[in-house]
Amino acid sequence: MNYSIIFYIIGWILKLEAIFMFLPGITAVIYGETSGFAFLITIIICLALGIPLTWKKPSKKAFYTKEGFVTVALSWIVLSIMGALPFIFSGSIPNPVDAIFETVSGFTTTGASILADVEILPHCVLIWRSFTHWIGGMGVLVFILSLLPLTGGYHMNLMKAERSEEHTS
C-alpha cells in the first residue's frame, strides 16, 4: 500500500477545504459575526494538517485500486469531520454527532437536517451549510479528481473505488 500518495492527496483535500472555508469567514467579517472565529480556527487546523502532508511529493506515485478505496474512504471521513468543526466551534450545533450528521448530509446531498429552523443560524454558518451542499452537489469525486495529476496517471483506480456497485462489472 502506497501510504505516501494517500496522505499526500488527503493533505491537498484538507488544504482545499480550508480554502472553501474562507468565504464563510469573509461573510462573518462583513456581518460582524463572532462565529467567524470558528472558521478561522478550522482553517488553521486544516492547514496545519494539510501542509505537512503535502510538503514533499511522494517519490513512489503508484496508485492502484486499494489505494483508491482507502483514499475515497479517508476523504469522506476527513471532509466530514473537518467540515463539522465550524458548526461545533461556533456553537450553532454543539453536539459533535449532530454536527457531523449535518455535514455528511450536506456533502452527500441527502437533504436531511437536525436543524428545525436554519434561519436562526449566523450568516457565515448558513453559507458554510450551503457550501457543503454545493460541494456535495458538484460531487466529492469531482473535487478529488482535481488532484489526480498528483497521482501520476493512476486516477482510474480512484474512479473505480468511487463508482457504485450497479456499474461494477
PLM-predicted stretches and their roles:
Residues 1-169:
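Membrane-proximal intracellular helices of multi-pass ion channels
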